[in-house]
């Protein structure tokens, strides 16, 4: 079968960003790469783009007329879905470059997020110097701040856009080069600073047989790992640090979504999990901690991160929440209970050591997980960062992944 020539897809709302889009197209063509320009404007006006807004909007489930309603908010949401579906139907997508303000960024990035990890994605945006998590999510989108507004060409915007063109062209070429693959299957592992010793022991034990992909449990970290599991790219998961659940349930800043553990249930991938850092909720700097939490047990992890110790009642709630999701998993599941503590701070003499709070967490898991031959809780009578715990996790993983 003849190989399909890959192209860079350049997306912009041509009614407001057409001048910048055409400038980028010329730069990319001069660089020798094939470009497909796509108009994602919601105004319905004509444009010189190779793919018209009408063609993109036709991919919306309710049709183009449901996109061009004249109501900006709903039109952006509809066109975003239409562009995602349009892009998913193209077999020659070698990279995607987007430009936009707040609306354009919200419109283009969902389609980028839906593409596989490794396909270059660059968004030049006025929003790129703020909180970009809603745009990037668990994907590998690169965000470039536009400095000036994307509202015409000037000496600053020309330079920034030229850099963006060079960056995406370079990534496009690099993505077509083979990457050395030693044949080891990949496993996903979750880690936090306070579970680092555990994960270091685990990766050292697995390294010879597996390509260990370690994900920082920052909310998007867990989502990234589960995205790979959903894509069939992981041979197994060692979800040793499930702390994102604390933030989701109790208002922290590093929260997972309600779909945490969903990819494990959908994929059936061999899964070893544990309670890593379920003793803490993450906030920003100390002065950002919500007023209702100011009298709680707080620990300044660093100037930008403040940790709040979970209570026995909160632990019982999150134990039940995790159990309910583990019960949906029909693949091989082993969830380890580190009876000596769940983080570096949850150890004798440390700030968060609380045997009663931990006991509430463990008991909730025992009370609510429906154990079967394939779904088991495993009691480990040591601290999570003890080498013996790591050994137990590795042994359980080997047992279920044969």
From Swiss-Prot:
Domain of life of the native organism: Bacteria
Name this polypeptide is given: UPF0261 protein BPP1817
InterPro entries on file: Tobamovirus_resist_UPF0261 (IPR051353), UPF0261 (IPR008322), UPF0261_C (IPR056778), UPF0261_N (IPR044122)
NCBIfam families, A to Z: PRK02399.1-1, PRK02399.1-2
Similarity remark: Belongs to the UPF0261 family.
Any one Pfam family match given in the protein's UniProt record, by short name: UPF0261
